[in-house]
């Protein structure tokens, strides 16, 4: 059994194959996922699992150098935005429109779908290097 906290084999597999600047998205339950992008669907019921707990678990495994967030997030869901900033600390944030974020999903290695129902609870994580 794995010693690290992330137990989902699909997420672990995607992360282990990622290289520098590859992208992985985490989305709320309403985020449209392109057909060509791998969908890792964790959504069980409304709110489960949550976006923040999923983000925290993935960040324990993935080295991230930059995040892409919809610029609408800060205004529409300010509490979520503050929590994201606290979690990612000094990681570079690039703000793009929600429409641009949805277009970027086709370039992601996968999208992890949560049960989250907070508006704009979506993020793209750009992989960094550990050396």
From Swiss-Prot:
<keyword id="KW-0119">Carbohydrate metabolism</keyword>
<comment type="similarity">
    <text>Belongs to the RbsD / FucU family. RbsD subfamily.</text>
</comment>
<comment type="function">
    <text>Catalyzes the interconversion of beta-pyran and beta-furan forms of D-ribose.</text>
</comment>
<keyword id="KW-0413">Isomerase</keyword>
<dbReference type="GO" id="GO:0048029">
    <property type="term" value="F:monosaccharide binding"/>
</dbReference>
<dbReference type="InterPro" id="IPR007721">
    <property type="entry name" value="RbsD_FucU"/>
</dbReference>
<dbReference type="GO" id="GO:0019303">
    <property type="term" value="P:D-ribose catabolic process"/>
</dbReference>
<feature type="binding site">
    <location>
        <position position="98"/>
    </location>
    <ligand>
        <name>substrate</name>
    </ligand>
</feature>
<feature type="active site" description="Proton donor">
    <location>
        <position position="20"/>
    </location>
</feature>
<dbReference type="Pfam" id="PF05025">
    <property type="entry name" value="RbsD_FucU"/>
</dbReference>
<dbReference type="GO" id="GO:0005829">
    <property type="term" value="C:cytosol"/>
</dbReference>
<protein>
    <recommendedName>
        <fullName>D-ribose pyranase</fullName>
        <ecNumber>5.4.99.62</ecNumber>
    </recommendedName>
</protein>
<dbReference type="GO" id="GO:0016872">
    <property type="term" value="F:intramolecular lyase activity"/>
</dbReference>
<dbReference type="GO" id="GO:0062193">
    <property type="term" value="F:D-ribose pyranase activity"/>
</dbReference>
<comment type="subunit">
    <text>Homodecamer.</text>
</comment>
<dbReference type="InterPro" id="IPR023750">
    <property type="entry name" value="RbsD-like_sf"/>
</dbReference>
<feature type="binding site">
    <location>
        <begin position="120"/>
        <end position="122"/>
    </location>
    <ligand>
        <name>substrate</name>
    </ligand>
</feature>
<comment type="pathway">
    <text>Carbohydrate metabolism; D-ribose degradation; D-ribose 5-phosphate from beta-D-ribopyranose: step 1/2.</text>
</comment>
<keyword id="KW-0963">Cytoplasm</keyword>
<dbReference type="InterPro" id="IPR023064">
    <property type="entry name" value="D-ribose_pyranase"/>
</dbReference>
<feature type="binding site">
    <location>
        <position position="28"/>
    </location>
    <ligand>
        <name>substrate</name>
    </ligand>
</feature>
